[in-house]
């Protein structure tokens, strides 16, 4: 008996709970529609569309629910789904002509002007209003513009094609056909911004493609130097996580951008040589960037290149300009005006003639080859482009002094050495010239004095630096007036004085009489 009670108790409880609580209630169609209406009003279009779908399952003949679901679909941009719902409405209730008008509007935006005209005619058979007349006019304009755009494309009239396809797209902005037509014509014109905008719209209209996001990421990174490149690659990988082309582009851009960020950080911190180290070399940032840019201009797997040749990628690449400008700045700030720095700065100037660092580099290099007036113009250009920066003013003043100096004494020319000659070369040149300048061998005291004056300046590190900066230590009108012969920090290889006697110190004497210069090796 006790066992029977233990078994019976759960059964009794279940029976009581069913009587008390009842079966789980199932919402009625009216309740579902009421909830869907609330969601639609709140802007929760996806949830509203699902709710209307549930109501339609309960009552497939209620065309009002199709209409409201179509409204939700339109708000979500699901135009094809909305078209299907409006078509279903007409099957249920052919007299509901408003569905024809809605289909006409959708088809017009899709660029299907002929079908839109058909739907609009079905609407105006029973009802005509100003909105329908306006739509009819727009469809006529759109059809004519599309026809003209196609004709212009066939004749290679790219600008005309762009103008007419633009007019047609004003009526049918969601038309992939018209959008691609304008892309083709704008590409021929090299209009990168228009192409980028249209490709972005096409990618949103067809998110299942991988080529468009790849093309967009390459344009965004190489041409526009935009952070949007990463977003486009994510779209590509979102659709196909295993896509090899998407992974390859992602890896390349990530590697380049990582090193570019390091270069920017080094330049900002003043460690210019470290920045140059990353930029330079066969595996340096600039070489890898140029290779990646070149790859983007080549067709792949039977598809067009990501960057059309009409874009002139090397000339118009903002990222290329940014990287070469960084390289130019690093070389200028490191006072590196050799061939490498010159190449970087000249490339920068070829893309942007208003880059300040490239003009500084050109000016400094012109100074080194003694083209004083050209150098003066270059550094003055940099000064003006910089907004008369006080950081550049010393370079202008230096060029001015050197230009003035060039019209006076040139100690390097006196010794016959280049401006970058080292101490040993200067001493050797002086000794050689002194043998020829001595009065006993056809020279003169004036020539010998000029040699001594030149050597005194160029053999002294401090005096030479002043002279190289345009301040002649022997010029009484210079910035620092003093007698450069008051000290011999650089060391004269000869000490001379007026006396009779031979020309000593060389392995062989020079015959002759009269006043002699006596030289003694240091």
From Swiss-Prot:
Its main location: endoplasmic reticulum. CDD domains: DnaJ (cd06257). It is found in: Endoplasmic reticulum lumen. GO terms for molecular function: misfolded protein binding; protein-folding chaperone binding. Endoplasmic reticulum co-chaperone crucial for survival and virulence factor production at elevated temperatures representative of febrile patients during infection. Contributes to virulence in a mouse model of cryptococcosis. With chaperone CNE1, coordinately maintains ER homeostasis and contributes to maintenance of cell wall architecture. The keyword Transcription does not apply. GO terms for biological process: protein folding in endoplasmic reticulum. Residues 465-494 are annotated as: Disordered. Residues 1-22 form the signal peptide. It comes from Cryptococcus neoformans var. grubii serotype A (strain H99 / ATCC 208821 / CBS 10515 / FGSC 9487). This is Tetratricopeptide repeat and J domain-containing co-chaperone DNJ1. TPR repeats lie at residues 29-62, 63-96, 97-130, 142-175, 210-243, 256-289, 356-389. InterPro entries: DnaJ_C3_Co-chaperones, DnaJ_domain, J_dom_sf, TPR-like_helical_dom_sf, TPR_rpt.
